[in-house]
Amino acid sequence: MEAAIVGQRQKSDDESGGDGNNKDSNSIAPSAIAINSKKKQTTKDIVTTQGAQFISESLIGETQTKDLDKPSAVHQRGIVPLCNGLDIIQQSLFGTTVTLCCGILQRLDYASTECQALVLVPTHDLAHETQNVIGVLGQFLSAKAHAFCGGTSAHEDQQILSTGVQVAVGTPCHVLGMLQGRALCPDHIRMFVLDEADEVLRGFKDQIHGIIQFLPTKTQFGFFSASMSHEALEMCRKYMNKPVEIIVPRDEELEGINVKQFYVNVEKEDCKLDKLCGLFDTMEITRSIIFVNTRHHAKSLTEKIRGKGYTVSAIHGGIHQRARDKAVQEFQSGSSRILITTDLRGIDVLRAPAAIFYDLPTQPVCYLRHVQSGQHGRKGVAISFITSTDERVFSTIQKFCNTQIEELPSNVADLL
């Protein structure tokens, strides 16, 4: 099934009333465009991949190791409008962080050290993860990003920005304070992006409106979300100039998931660790990613599993980049067979045959994202630990995924 797509022409002063600013509720209704319509590309380092995605040569070396040389539906649909400078609204379950980061990296002027892109997210963890994604994808371009989430003074923020931060990532309240306090100069910002836009607009509507008032009139907008309420969609349109609107159907995104899903009944929380160790011994899992819901649980479970004699690493929003890189390298090299992580999103470089939900995510979309982590169409298994308190959420997840998750069979070792 093709995504629903409506589009726009490139902004110009003539089209927006003479001053380049058409961010109001009277925006012209979008006109239909074809997904594979060819647009003239004058930049020499832009190449096409599978006829629908544009990735710069400078990014190719890095993205090939992350399966972006085989773009997903969401990558194909989102990156092209971003690279062409168009406003975009995209609703999809997977890939939004990578899509928006690729688009930003190809729109930056690397001769300038001014802040040129502003990305807002609802949580501190997602801000740090987005910073990490830009750092990894943009390492050959010398792109510099920083997460601004509070805990720093206006002077400290200014000092960080003065080092040449080209992409500022942050939470709405703190970023608005930076703009009001003149710690962040908006004059050179050319892209304004919301990830998890539905949640951001629902919880920080006034702050978003305040931030937009500081932006240059020709700023490109990109709003991305796994879900999009009618109210949020109308708010997006209010601020944009004839946006490209992309809705990737859920059934299309689910087609690439080739993972067998099971659950394990656990009497109480204290029994989970023994169940987990039993799985390791029974299944002889070479590598597994274990998902928990909080940083504290990630830290405590890491120590408990390590105490059982297993090699384990952990990544979450509370660790520094160097420690995160070390944990990923250990897992990729095989020196650590277990990786414990929280609800982090971004570049999926971690391939593992098993995903284990030690804590069941409270949001179905988080479950789906984790199920497809590291698979890219490859076979795998996902196992959820279910206590009596998880039953309602577990039922919601099954309905959302349109699947019946079965109890883990005794011959589980044959599944890998």
Curated annotation (Swiss-Prot):
ATP binds at S92, L93, F94, G95, T96, T97, V98, T99. One of its GO terms (cellular component) is cytoplasmic stress granule. A motif (DEAD box) lies at residues 195-198. SMART domains: DEXDc, HELICc. Its main location: cytoplasm. It is an enzyme of class 3 (hydrolase). Residues 1-36 are annotated as: Disordered. It catalyses: ATP + H2O = ADP + phosphate + H(+). Keywords: ATP-binding, Cytoplasm, Helicase, Hydrolase, Initiation factor, Nucleotide-binding, Protein biosynthesis, RNA-binding. It comes from the Eukaryota. GO terms for molecular function: ATP binding; ATP hydrolysis activity; RNA binding; RNA helicase activity; translation initiation factor activity. Its EC number is 3.6.4.13. Residues 79-246 form the Helicase ATP-binding domain. Residues 258-416 form the Helicase C-terminal domain. Pfam families: DEAD (PF00270), Helicase_C (PF00271). A motif (Q motif) lies at residues 48-76. It is found in: Cytoplasm. One of its GO terms (biological process) is cytoplasmic translational initiation. The Q motif is unique to and characteristic of the DEAD box family of RNA helicases and controls ATP binding and hydrolysis. Belongs to the DEAD box helicase family. eIF4A subfamily. ATP-dependent RNA helicase which is a subunit of the eIF4F complex involved in cap recognition and is required for mRNA binding to ribosome. In the current model of translation initiation, eIF4A unwinds RNA secondary structures in the 5'-UTR of mRNAs which is necessary to allow efficient binding of the small ribosomal subunit, and subsequent scanning for the initiator codon. eIF4F is a multi-subunit complex, the composition of which varies with external and internal environmental conditions. It is composed of at least EIF4A, EIF4E and EIF4G. This is Putative eukaryotic initiation factor 4A-2. It comes from Oryza sativa subsp. japonica.
